Amino acid sequence: MKTTILGAGSFGTAIAFALSSNSTSVNLWGRNHTDMQSIAINRKNLKYLPTCKLPENIIVSSNIDEVLSDYSTCIILAVPTQQLRTLCLSIQDKQHIFEKTPLLICSKGIENISLKFPSEIVKEILPNNPAFILSGPSFAKEIAEDLPCTIVLAGENESLGTSIAQKISNKTFKIIYSQDILGVQIGAALKNIIAIACGIVTGKNLGNNAIATVITKGMEEIKTLYAAKNQNINLSTLIGPSCLGDLILTCTTAHSRNMSFGITIGQGADINKMLNNNSKIIEGVSTVKPLISLAKELNIELPICTSIYNLLYKNIPLEKTISDIL
């Protein structure tokens, strides 16, 4: 089996580690030539996973034509949601090379202008390729260190999805197939915003009871959006790895970028400076704007998510935000 990963950030690199154990080769592509040269020379992604050495069968490249021409079993799209459309458009004219190759999307969130989820963006631009979502509780560093995790591969084609899940799973990197591609993406999008709220509560030293309150209310908001987008709620999605599992992981440790961001806010940091100076993408920050627009369009209320939006972009005081989310 050959696999190709487009996106050499922390998660794309970690997935390369996971797939290297049962692939003859893994292509890891990134658009920045200098960064990819550094990874190739050092056999480490010094920017994101500096302590993890790449296995020899991971081939590092900044040449997208080269990696797409390698006829992979599947292509993994591992870029932030707000960059996903640009990536798909950049390979659209090469679709004849990888036509019908399954695309596994790791992006989490909602696109700013279109208010589309990642699978909807991919299906719009690359309609001939089966699209799946790969999501669940999975910190990149732990995947790269071969620590156990269980995540979900969601898509409409059950036979193909089940086959891919079996091929890319190994002893520590376990994949569960689900047909609920929408529910999985809703959980993935909202959990990052809820994690910011949990971080704020943690930064203010309000205790574990308060964190549990935010997680519980956050789960209800995931359910609210899910019901508004699809009346046939799948309970196994809500209580499975991609919703409840990912929510718990992201909301209970400072290893989560989103929770860490919230902790810093709770400790009194200047929010505008944080928004302008943060070098790493905080998915909850980039998701909350389109989410609130989508909620208005669907005529639903998401109190915690709205409170985080108002704090970040409407200058609502921190104490008022804490009161609202609790």
Swiss-Prot record:
Keywords in alphabetical order: Cytoplasm, Lipid biosynthesis, Lipid metabolism, NAD, NADP, Nucleotide-binding, Oxidoreductase, Phospholipid biosynthesis, Phospholipid metabolism
Query: What chemistry does it catalyse, as a reaction equation?
Result: sn-glycerol 3-phosphate + NAD(+) = dihydroxyacetone phosphate + NADH + H(+); sn-glycerol 3-phosphate + NADP(+) = dihydroxyacetone phosphate + NADPH + H(+)
Top-rank EC class of the record's enzyme: oxidoreductase
**One Gene Ontology molecular-function label:** glycerol-3-phosphate dehydrogenase [NAD(P)+] activity
User: Pathway of this protein?
Assistant: Membrane lipid metabolism; glycerophospholipid metabolism
Residues at the catalytic site: K191 (proton acceptor)
Which top-rank group of organisms is this from? Bacteria
Which PROSITE patterns is this protein grouped with? NAD_G3PDH (PS00957)
Positions contributing to NADPH binding: S10, F11, R31, K108, A140, R257, I281, E283
* Location, primary (coarse class): cytoplasm
Its GO biological process terms?
Answer: carbohydrate metabolic process; glycerol-3-phosphate biosynthetic process; glycerol-3-phosphate catabolic process; glycerophospholipid metabolic process; phospholipid biosynthetic process
- Entry's InterPro entries? 6-PGluconate_DH-like_C_sf, 6PGD_dom2, G3P_DH_NAD-dep, G3P_DH_NAD-dep_C, G3P_DH_NAD-dep_N, NAD(P)-bd_dom_sf
Question: What positions does the entry give for sn-glycerol 3-phosphate binding?
Answer: K108, G136, S138, K191, D246, S256, R257, N258
Q: What is its EC number?
A: 1.1.1.94
Q: Which Pfam families match?
A: NAD_Gly3P_dh_C, NAD_Gly3P_dh_N
**Location of the protein in the cell:** Cytoplasm
Report the GO terms under cellular component. cytosol
Q: Which family does it belong to?
A: Belongs to the NAD-dependent glycerol-3-phosphate dehydrogenase family.
State its role: Catalyzes the reduction of the glycolytic intermediate dihydroxyacetone phosphate (DHAP) to sn-glycerol 3-phosphate (G3P), the key precursor for phospholipid synthesis.
Q: What is this protein called?
A: Glycerol-3-phosphate dehydrogenase [NAD(P)+]
**What species does this protein belong to?**
Ehrlichia chaffeensis (strain ATCC CRL-10679 / Arkansas)
Task: List the lineage, top down.
Answer: Bacteria, Pseudomonadati, Pseudomonadota, Alphaproteobacteria, Rickettsiales
